[in-house]
């Protein structure tokens, strides 16, 4: 029997507004353990403290929004890493790219628009994590694996450019109603794995072809004041009811100590999703794991299927708090998606 224990939903506002209650000096999780002071700190990362800034157009990336410049942008990331780290800056303008891989000591600051290619060939097949299993699948637009202190920041936009991918999905689904999420080949927007002390702040994360943000086997991860959006209708002319399929806002997969604070989420699927693995032997597979100590607060939801969803690839979820949030059009505040094949 799956153990989903000690879930607390406190001060969830469905309509209108509510007075914020004064918090106790020492906060606790639902099981009575003391909440670490890390969760009280919503201070933004000071980009100036992250080291030298590498403005991509100063290092060979052109001001041309019509050509895919993956190689040139990746070269800037690689140079920053060789030089000891720093901030890769996307300036004003639109820059088209495929999969980018960040390295230890490098960070991403977006002022303009970093836009994903509509060609799946620009996203290599790699060993990754998707839908509760470790397998070969396409890299995301922004990838960070095994990093300590990685930061995405800025008032700009990371745009997945998903329309082509969404339309292909609905064409496949109309031809074959059994078409799965992975049958339609689509990249995610951001994928952070095996990392710690990660902050994603202020940035606009929009139009993801697949899941918008996916964080796996990581700890002490913060999403602060992000704007996360994918259309919920009118992406496929034969059926205007169709939106961006499987565009979850934030998928938290086998992670501990995650905070989502002050974010806006409007997507054609679930908002914050807890995942961990699937299958008969899911709890025996070392690539799977629990989600523990997850705090979601001060967020606003537009149209979403579930504000907080557990599953369907979920194992043991403990000490989860959703509080002081506002929803306009959510189908559900809390949704349990149970799988008969998973203990």
Where are these regions (language model features)?
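Extracellular "leader-to-stem" segments immediately downstream of a signal peptide or signal-anchor
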Residues: 1-3, 16-107, 113-194, 199-201, ...
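Hydrophobic h-region of N-terminal signal peptides that target proteins for export
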Residues: 9-17
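Short, T/G/N/S-enriched strand-turn elements that build extracellular solenoid repeat scaffolds
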Residues: 77-81, 96-104, 211-217, 261-263, ...
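Transmembrane beta-strand segments that form the barrel wall of outer-membrane beta-barrel proteins
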Residues: 93, 308-310, 334, 338
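Right-handed parallel beta-helix
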Residues: 111-113, 148-157, 196-207, 219-233, ...
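Residue-level marker of regulatory loop/turn positions in helix-turn-helix DNA-binding domains and
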Residues: 182-184, 192, 215, 242, ...
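Short, intrinsically disordered, charge-balanced linker/junction segments flanking boundaries
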Residues: 340-343
